[in-house]
C-alpha cells in the first residue's frame, strides 16, 4: 500500500513538473535594452500581450548584443530592434543603403536565422548631432556640412560623443571621411550617452551626439544638424520575433503591427520625455498611450 501511494505521489509530481514546463514553454518572453525608449516599448508590448490573454514575462535592461544573442538562443522571444543596428552590428553589412533597402536586407538575413521582422514603424532613432537653438544664429550651424566647414576653418567646436559612437563604423571616424573634416582630439569629449545631453544643455560642449527620438531634444531646446549627405543609416524601430513563437501565436503579427504603425519620431520623443523629463513611470506612460490609441 505504501509503495502504491509513493508511486502515485511520484506520478503526480512528474505530471506537475511536465505541466509546469509546458506552461513555461508557452510564455512569451519580451526583451528590451537598457534605455528609456526600450523600456517603454517593452512595457507596451507586455501590456498588449496581457490584454490578449497571452502569457508573458519581461526581461529588460539588457545590452544590445546580449538581447540579440538571447533571442538567437531562444531565451528571448520578442523585442524591438533597430534596422541599422541589425544591419551593421549583427550582420556586418557596411554598404550604404536606403531605409527601405536596410529593412529588406535585415529581414532577409535574419529570416535565415529564424527571426521575423514585422512591420517597421516610422520612428527612426538614428544618430544625430545637435546644437543649442540659441546658438544657431551666431554659429551658422544648420547642417553637418556646415559643421565640417567650421572644423576645416579651424574653429574651436567642442563635441561630446559616446565611446560607442567614437568607435563604430557609422560613428565619428567615417562621418569625418564622408564630410571631409577632422575633430581635433582635444575637442572631442567621450562620455556616457545620457551625459552628452546635459553637457550640451549646460554649455560644456558646442555640439553633442543625440538619438533622434530622445525626449530631451525638444525639452532642452536643441536643434538637430541636418545630415545633408545622408551618412547615418536608418534606425527604424521594428518588432522582431522568433519564427517558432510566431507560429505558436500567429495573432502576435496583427497585435504588434497595430502598435508599430502608431509610432513615429514625434510620438517617441513625446513618450520618452514623459518618462525622462516629466518623471512619469514607464508603466503609466505605456498604458496611457495604448488606451489613447484604442489598443487596450
Give short role names for the model-derived ranges.
Residues 36-55, 71, 173-177:
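Short, polar/charged alpha-helical segment
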Residues 27-43, 60-64, 164-167:
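Extracytoplasmic "Venus flytrap"
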Residues 127-137, 236-249:
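A bilobed periplasmic-binding-protein/Venus flytrap-type ligand-binding module shared by bacterial periplasmic
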Residues 101-158, 261-265:
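A conserved helix-loop-strand patch within extracytoplasmic ligand-binding domains
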Residues 90-118, 204, 216-230:
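Ligand-binding "clamshell"
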Residues 154-227:
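Ligand-binding pocket segment of bilobal, Venus flytrap-like solute-binding proteins
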Residues 37, 166-181, 250-296:
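An extracytoplasmic/periplasmic, membrane-proximal ligand-sensing/linker region
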Amino acid at each position: 500500500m505504501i509503495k502504491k501511494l509513493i508511486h502515485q505521489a511520484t506520478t503526480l509530481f512528474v505530471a506537475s513538473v511536465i505541466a509546469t514546463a509546458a506552461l513555461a514553454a508557452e510564455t512569451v518572453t519580451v526583451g528590451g535594452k537598457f534605455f528609456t525608449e526600450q523600456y517603454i516599448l517593452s512595457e507596451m508590448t507586455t501590456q498588449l500581450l496581457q490584454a490578449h490573454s497571452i502569457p508573458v514575462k519581461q526581461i529588460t535592461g539588457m545590452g544590445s548584443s546580449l538581447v540579440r544573442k538571447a533571442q538567437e538562443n531562444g531565451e528571448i522571444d520578442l523585442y524591438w530592434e533597430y534596422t541599422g543596428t541589425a544591419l551593421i552590428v549583427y550582420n556586418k553589412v557596411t554598404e550604404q543603403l536606403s531605409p527601405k533597402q536596410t529593412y529588406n536586407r535585415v529581414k532577409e538575413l535574419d529570416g535565415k536565422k529564424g527571426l521575423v521582422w514585422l512591420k517597421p514603424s516610422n520612428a527612426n532613432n538614428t544618430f544625430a548631432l545637435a546644437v543649442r537653438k540659441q546658438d544657431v544664429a551666431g554659429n551658422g550651424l544648420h547642417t553637418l556640412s556646415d559643421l565640417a566647414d567650421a572644423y576645416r576653418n579651424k574653429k574651436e567646436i567642442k563635441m561630446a560623443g559616446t565611446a560607442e559612437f567614437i568607435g563604430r563604423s557609422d560613428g565619428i571616424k567615417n562621418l569625418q571621411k564622408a564630410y571631409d573634416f577632422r575633430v581635433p582630439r582635444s575637442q572631442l569629449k567621450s562620455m556616457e550617452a545620457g551625459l552628452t545631453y546635459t553637457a550640451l544643455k549646460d554649455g560644456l560642449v558646442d555640439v553633442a551626439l543625440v538619438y533622434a527620438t530622445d525626449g530631451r531634444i525638444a525639452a532642452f531646446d536643441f536643434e538637430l544638424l541636418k545630415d545633408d549627405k545622408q551618412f547615418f543609416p536608418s534606425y527604424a524601430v521594428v518588432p522582431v520575433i522568433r519564427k517558432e513563437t510566431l507560429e505558436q501565436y500567429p495573432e502576435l503579427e496583427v497585435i504588434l503591427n497595430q502598435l508599430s504603425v502608431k509610432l513615429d519620431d514625434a510620438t517617441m520623443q513625446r513618450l520618452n520625455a514623459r518618462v525622462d523629463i516629466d518623471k512619469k513611470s514607464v508603466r503609466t506612460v505605456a498604458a496611457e498611450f495604448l488606451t489613447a490609441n484604442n489598443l487596450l
